[in-house]
């Protein structure tokens, strides 16, 4: 798809699952792919797989809960590919703080879930959207 050629996407939680599948799909269509994930081992495997498929990839260890990590990801993406055109806020958890009876989970469990699933999205948007706008608002 010509629409994607030469564009750059940042995918959080991009080392496996839906994030990796999206990174792979848009990479095959010509996008530069920046995958950010908290798991260095899984990230290394994902980076190798995408590279072997000829997809331009930058893989960065990052915690979606960290605004500083998001800023670092955006800066690295710009440094490597020159612009950011799209963001897929995919990092998320469904673990200890979000399943089972509410009375079985601590406030810390819920804070962790909210920090990843909500604040991770907020920080991603805050760090990346200005660069998407600078690149023309996507495409």
Where are these regions (language model features)?
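Canonical Rossmann dinucleotide-binding motif of NAD(H)/NADP(H)-dependent dehydrogenases/reductases
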Residues: 2-34
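Active-site loop of short-chain dehydrogenase/reductase
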Residues: 7, 56, 83-84, 132-139
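The beta1-alpha1 cofactor-binding region of Rossmann-like NAD(H)/NADP(H)-dependent oxidoreductases
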Residues: 40-41, 61-72, 107
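A glycine-rich helix->loop->beta "capping" turn
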Residues: 53-56, 76-87, 106-109
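Conserved NAD(P)H cofactor-binding loop of Rossmann-fold oxidoreductase domains
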Residues: 90-98
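A short, exposed helix-loop element centered on a Lys and neighboring polar residues
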Residues: 125-126
């Amino acid at each position: 798809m010509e629409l994607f050629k030469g564009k750059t996407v940042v995918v959080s939680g991009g080392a496996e699952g839906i994030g990796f599948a999206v990174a792979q799909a848009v990479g095959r269509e010509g996008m530069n792919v920046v995958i950010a994930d908290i798991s260095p081992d899984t990230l290394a495997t994902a980076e190798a797989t995408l590279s072997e498929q000829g997809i331009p990839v930058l893989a960065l260890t990052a915690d979606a809960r960290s605004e500083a990590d998001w800023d670092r990801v955006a800066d690295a993406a710009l440094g490597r590919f020159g612009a950011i055109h799209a963001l897929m806020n995919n990092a998320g958890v469904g673990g200890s703080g979000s399943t089972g009876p509410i009375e079985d989970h601590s406030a810390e469990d819920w804070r962790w879930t909210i920090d990843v699933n909500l604040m991770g999205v907020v920080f991603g948007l805050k760090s990346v959207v200005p660069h998407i706008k600078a690149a023309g608002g996507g495409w």
